[in-house]
């Protein structure tokens, strides 16, 4: 049996769905699953300190290979002792491969078998990223969980294009495995692609499972498709992945999508959504989204969320938060970001309890009704 640096332990399956309760053991600690991972693109979760993230209960955070490669540079971070030491974070870190950022640069990139040529968004210089380079950068960063370099095709691209793309991504995954110099302390995940095509998802998963990665990511979702389309892809993709390894749905952070992903057997999620919307004054609460900058909250001296026990809700009012954000004060962004991250990490805690109690579907229904989703449009 292969000795992986990342291992998944299944604790319990929910009786009525594909949801599973477990934990993932990494070189920098163990965290429970299902789990939402805050995103620290530039080696920091925007406005939050490592101590605050630990208070929130984030046992793992995500950082971005592409951005750290460009600035300050992966070799500098290696000289600093690795990403954990550089950013003073002693728990687990996951790094993406840079593939999604390159996907986002559609107008300035060129994809070949060797890799991707694109323009540096900081200074316009020409850059080249290959599977080997993506692995080398992540080896220098020293993250606990790494991602294979992949192409993320658009969800509605033609079948023939997506087929060629997933076949190239499989070849890139094999090249990345061979280039990986730290398999003893960094777990490399394969990324299943295939847009909305079931047979291509099946082909991609079969290729990658055959390479025996310690975990698997589901990519190419949350890129413009509908909620129903995402659920349909998860319905036929997640069962293709090994039960004894972690499953990670990339780029998903809307509460309903988190719950529906868990129902389909996903263990890990990440998204910039909670911090991005928080900085603009949009807060997630147990009764739906609340835009605290709105004028009606100017004299509202109640907490953001009466059902939340986070630091922000225990100490500050909607009126004060509105004042800070209207005045462009960083402290306001810190407080709303803290709350939104706490909300999603705590939502996953509630989901784990619902799995333990075998009542996840009832929890989902109750949550959707309170949050304000039209549950009839969120069928699964």
UniProtKB/Swiss-Prot annotation:
<dbReference type="InterPro" id="IPR004803">
    <property type="entry name" value="TGT"/>
</dbReference>
<feature type="binding site">
    <location>
        <position position="339"/>
    </location>
    <ligand>
        <name>Zn(2+)</name>
    </ligand>
</feature>
<dbReference type="GO" id="GO:0101030">
    <property type="term" value="P:tRNA-guanine transglycosylation"/>
</dbReference>
<dbReference type="GO" id="GO:0046872">
    <property type="term" value="F:metal ion binding"/>
</dbReference>
<keyword id="KW-0479">Metal-binding</keyword>
<dbReference type="GO" id="GO:0005829">
    <property type="term" value="C:cytosol"/>
</dbReference>
<feature type="region of interest" description="RNA binding">
    <location>
        <begin position="251"/>
        <end position="257"/>
    </location>
</feature>
<feature type="binding site">
    <location>
        <position position="310"/>
    </location>
    <ligand>
        <name>Zn(2+)</name>
    </ligand>
</feature>
<keyword id="KW-0819">tRNA processing</keyword>
<dbReference type="InterPro" id="IPR002616">
    <property type="entry name" value="tRNA_ribo_trans-like"/>
</dbReference>
<protein>
    <recommendedName>
        <fullName>Queuine tRNA-ribosyltransferase</fullName>
        <ecNumber>2.4.2.29</ecNumber>
    </recommendedName>
</protein>
<dbReference type="InterPro" id="IPR036511">
    <property type="entry name" value="TGT-like_sf"/>
</dbReference>
<keyword id="KW-0328">Glycosyltransferase</keyword>
<dbReference type="GO" id="GO:0008616">
    <property type="term" value="P:queuosine biosynthetic process"/>
</dbReference>
<feature type="binding site">
    <location>
        <position position="308"/>
    </location>
    <ligand>
        <name>Zn(2+)</name>
    </ligand>
</feature>
<comment type="subunit">
    <text>Homodimer. Within each dimer, one monomer is responsible for RNA recognition and catalysis, while the other monomer binds to the replacement base PreQ1.</text>
</comment>
<keyword id="KW-0808">Transferase</keyword>
<keyword id="KW-0862">Zinc</keyword>
<feature type="binding site">
    <location>
        <position position="313"/>
    </location>
    <ligand>
        <name>Zn(2+)</name>
    </ligand>
</feature>
<dbReference type="GO" id="GO:0002099">
    <property type="term" value="P:tRNA wobble guanine modification"/>
</dbReference>
<comment type="function">
    <text>Catalyzes the base-exchange of a guanine (G) residue with the queuine precursor 7-aminomethyl-7-deazaguanine (PreQ1) at position 34 (anticodon wobble position) in tRNAs with GU(N) anticodons (tRNA-Asp, -Asn, -His and -Tyr). Catalysis occurs through a double-displacement mechanism. The nucleophile active site attacks the C1' of nucleotide 34 to detach the guanine base from the RNA, forming a covalent enzyme-RNA intermediate. The proton acceptor active site deprotonates the incoming PreQ1, allowing a nucleophilic attack on the C1' of the ribose to form the product.</text>
</comment>
<feature type="binding site">
    <location>
        <position position="220"/>
    </location>
    <ligand>
        <name>substrate</name>
    </ligand>
</feature>
<feature type="binding site">
    <location>
        <position position="193"/>
    </location>
    <ligand>
        <name>substrate</name>
    </ligand>
</feature>
<feature type="active site" description="Nucleophile">
    <location>
        <position position="270"/>
    </location>
</feature>
<dbReference type="Pfam" id="PF01702">
    <property type="entry name" value="TGT"/>
</dbReference>
<feature type="region of interest" description="RNA binding; important for wobble base 34 recognition">
    <location>
        <begin position="275"/>
        <end position="279"/>
    </location>
</feature>
<comment type="pathway">
    <text>tRNA modification; tRNA-queuosine biosynthesis.</text>
</comment>
<dbReference type="GO" id="GO:0008479">
    <property type="term" value="F:tRNA-guanosine(34) queuine transglycosylase activity"/>
</dbReference>
<feature type="active site" description="Proton acceptor">
    <location>
        <position position="96"/>
    </location>
</feature>
<feature type="binding site">
    <location>
        <begin position="96"/>
        <end position="100"/>
    </location>
    <ligand>
        <name>substrate</name>
    </ligand>
</feature>
<dbReference type="InterPro" id="IPR050076">
    <property type="entry name" value="ArchSynthase1/Queuine_TRR"/>
</dbReference>
<keyword id="KW-0671">Queuosine biosynthesis</keyword>
<comment type="similarity">
    <text>Belongs to the queuine tRNA-ribosyltransferase family.</text>
</comment>
<feature type="binding site">
    <location>
        <position position="150"/>
    </location>
    <ligand>
        <name>substrate</name>
    </ligand>
</feature>
